[in-house]
A protein has these predicted regions:
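Short hydrophobic beta-strand element within catalytic cores of glycosyltransferases
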Residues: 319-320, 341-347
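Glycosyltransferase donor-sugar binding loop
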Residues: 48, 241, 266-284, 299-303
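A charged, aromatic-enriched C-terminal amphipathic alpha-helix characteristic of glycosyltransferases
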Residues: 21, 368, 381-415
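Conserved donor-binding/catalytic core segment of Leloir-type glycosyltransferases
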Residues: 11, 228-248, 254-257, 267-268
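Nucleotide-activated donor-binding/catalytic signature segment of Leloir-type glycosyltransferases, i.e.
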Residues: 280-312, 316
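Donor nucleotide-sugar binding/catalytic pocket of nucleotide-sugar-dependent glycosyltransferases
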Residues: 161-172, 181-224
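Acidic donor-binding loop of glycosyltransferase active sites
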Residues: 312-329
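A short, glycine/small-residue-rich beta-strand->loop->alpha-helix junction that serves as a flexible
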Residues: 13-27, 144-145, 248, 328
């Protein structure tokens, strides 16, 4: 059974909105699948933001017109089911928080979403659109508690194929959702993971998706870019951005800034700082920066909702800093580097180091060696054949390739439902 030009919908669910990577991919997936002939229900916790990203001022998204999108696209908000449940959850959250304060309990950090919530949201959708859902693709299976007991009682009112995207597998093949007979498979951003999981779960279907990115630019220069260019003057701009937590290696970033020539280099940091996810060294660096702001560091501590502005800043930078700590997976920053032809400096570890070494689009450095990173900034633009290297990377990590793989994955997932 094919869902292309079918009356049934593919549900694309992004469970965590206002996170750059996922928001970007949600829009790209909608565009790709609509162009391929699928009808889409886009489920999100922030439908207003998604609509804003989909429909530009000129009412186009890429080469897909707003009219074409409207004919095959429904955008819905994912909300708790029912007013009583909403009230109960809010009351429970308030009570727990109040008791924690009164009795001095340590703060509880939520690390995963509950599979039961996913089940409630999907069942509400199945009731609203009976016999109209052909497949559900969850954009971030990493977000859910992988423990088998959490998935033991997961049920859907109507059995439909369920599949997902997994950015960072963490459970050693023990994710509970693989025990669901209607869970058909997973897309990974690393082919090594695809091969490993396919060997483990031969009855499921797995696909590798190149980590591509939105590369659109605004029609007119943004106010944020103007501020940065004024601040930078004639200095070379080193860009670091995205959701900023401990993996961004803030401690080393600040040390590199301190060790660099004030008159030659300007460092630009764009993105919301996740202060609940920093190392002690990161916190000390931020405290020092607040007390003694560096003359060569521009900081925008906030989520840039319009990715075109994020891209615009990269396009005016000279080098991308992505020397992440304990970060083994892919990053769409590599695709941004290749598309905007900006050499990127990364850590030697993980998928990013492997790809930069393979395609020669930047340098790999030790994430703990400040001087090695500083030296790399001075030599990175001397890499031979950089433009050809960028072109090769773009060919292998193209939107067309992702679209073909995604379509194949969906068709296979539907076709293999027993």
């Amino acid at each position: 059974m094919s869902l292309i030009h079918s009356e049934k919908y593919v549900v694309l669910y992004n469970p965590i909105s206002n996170e750059g990577h996922l928001d970007s991919w949600h829009v790209l997936f909608i565009k790709m699948l609509t162009q391929a002939g699928f009808k889409i229900i886009a489920l999100t916790s922030d439908p207003i933001a998604l609509r804003k990203k989909l429909y530009d001022v000129d009412q186009t998204v890429g080469s897909t017109s707003a009219q074409a999108l409207g004919q095959g696209l429904i955008v819905l908000g994912a909300e708790p089911v029912g007013l009583v449940q909403k009230f109960g959850r809010r009351l429970s959250h308030y009570s727990t928080k109040t008791l924690d304060v009164l009795f001095g309990r340590p703060k509880r950090r939520v690390t995963h979403l509950e599979p039961s919530m996913l089940g409630q949201q999907l069942n509400a959708l199945l009731v609203r659109y009976p016999e109209k859902i052909g497949l559900v693709l969850n954009m971030y299976m990493d977000a859910y508690d992988p423990a088998p007991e959490q998935w033991k009682h997961f049920r859907l009112k109507t059995v439909v194929p369920l599949a997902g995207v997994c950015i960072t597998p963490q459970s050693g093949y023990s994710e509970g959702y693989y025990g669901l007979p209607f869970y058909r498979g997973t897309c990974f951003l690393d082919d090594t993971w695809r091969e490993a999981y396919q060997a483990k779960f031969t009855e499921k279907y797995f696909e590798y998706l190149p980590d591509v990115t939105d590369t659109r630019l605004p029609k007119t220069p943004s106010a944020l870019l103007q501020q940065i260019l004024t601040f930078a003057r004639d200095r070379k701009i080193v860009f670091m951005g995205g959701s900023i937590g401990k993996q961004k290696n803030l401690t080393r970033w600040h040390q590199v800034i301190a060790a660099s020539d004030l008159e030659q280099w300007c460092f630009v940091q764009i993105g919301r700082i996740n202060r609940n996810n920093l190392t002690e060294g990161d916190e000390k660096s931020l405290t020092l920066q607040a007390r003694q702001p560096r003359e060569n560091l521009f900081v925008h501590d906030g989520y840039v909702e319009d990715e075109r502005i994020f891209n615009e800043i990269i396009s005016h930078s000279h080098i991308i800093f992505a020397v992440y700590r304990d970060f083994t997976r892919s990053s769409n920053m590599l695709s941004k580097a290749a598309y905007f032809e900006k050499p990127i400096v990364v850590s030697t570890e993980g998928v990013m180091g492997k790809r930069v070494n393979q395609y020669k689009i930047g340098l790999c450095v030790n994430p703990d060696m400040t001087q090695e990173i500083v030296n790399g900034l001075s030599t990175i633009e001397q890499i031979a054949n950089l433009q050809d290297n960028f072109r090769l990377y773009r060919n292998d990590f193209s939107l067309e390739m992702v679209q073909a793989k995604l379509v194949r994955f969906i068709e296979q997932s539907v076709g293999t439902l027993g």
